[in-house]
Amino acid sequence: MKKGLMLIVLVAGLCGITKAQAQVEEVIIEQRLPGYKTSFEANPFWHNWFVSANFGANAFFAEHSSQAKFKNTITFMPELAVGKMFNPWWGLRLQGGGGALHGFTDNAGSMLHMHYMHMNIDFMMGLINFFAKYNPDRKFDIVPFFGVGGMTRKHQQSFTIHGGIQAKYKISERFDANIEFQGMIFNDKMVETGGFPNDGLGGLTAGVTYYFKGRGFRTAPK
């Protein structure tokens, strides 16, 4: 009788150990999943919103730009944006900016100083958070973005295609520092018509991003 009872207790103990090991292995496997295979809890609408301000320089590429000195094509570039992250690796933002463009006549004989404004909506994808194991304490990410928008100058308007890449570093729960390279293509009629079917603008900026209260995500239980 005692031997039978001991055997039952031993079998139950072994089953418990095996189950615990399986749970540990399952947790380890789950922790090793990349971000795109990880499920996250839905966050409230007002969580993970951010605003950012960047400042730098851009260069205008159009007819006769290659005939001018590169330094003469460069102008100041301010950019402001507001957006929301929907999970750790993707989000949307609305970005706007403006300033001056330096175009040129034939043989760069004279410079055209033109003011413009633009606005675009971008899809943003964090590559490291997408491919690497999800880590809420991760400091660094590389974020390509692509979007569409519009541009205006005096009485001219144009549809724009916008894209680039951002490197960001998490300073604190509320602040990120970032460096961003971006480019924009728009209609040739915006400046000096002729030559290229489209004109372009390329810029390099640096700035900060502020996250409102409620930043972060929780993995969804299985």
Feature roles, as predicted:
Residues 38-48, 89, 128-141, 171-174, ...:
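Short loop/turn motifs that connect adjacent beta-strands in outer-membrane beta-barrel proteins
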Residues 20-83:
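Short glycine/proline- and aromatic-enriched beta-strand/turn motifs that initiate or cap beta-hairpins
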Residues 50-52, 91-93, 141-145, 176-178, ...:
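Residue-level detector of the transmembrane beta-barrel scaffold of outer-membrane proteins
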Residues 1-44, 214-222:
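Cleavable N-terminal export/targeting peptides
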Residues 88-161:
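Gram-negative (and chloroplast) outer-membrane scaffold detector with strong preference
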Residues 47, 70-78, 115-119, 138-140, ...:
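Residues that define the transmembrane beta-barrel architecture of outer-membrane proteins
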Residues 101, 105-109, 170-222:
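Predominantly the C-terminal beta-signal and adjacent terminal strand-loop region
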Residues 53-57, 80-84, 121-127, 146-150, ...:
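Residues on the lipid-exposed face of transmembrane beta-strands in outer-membrane beta-barrel proteins
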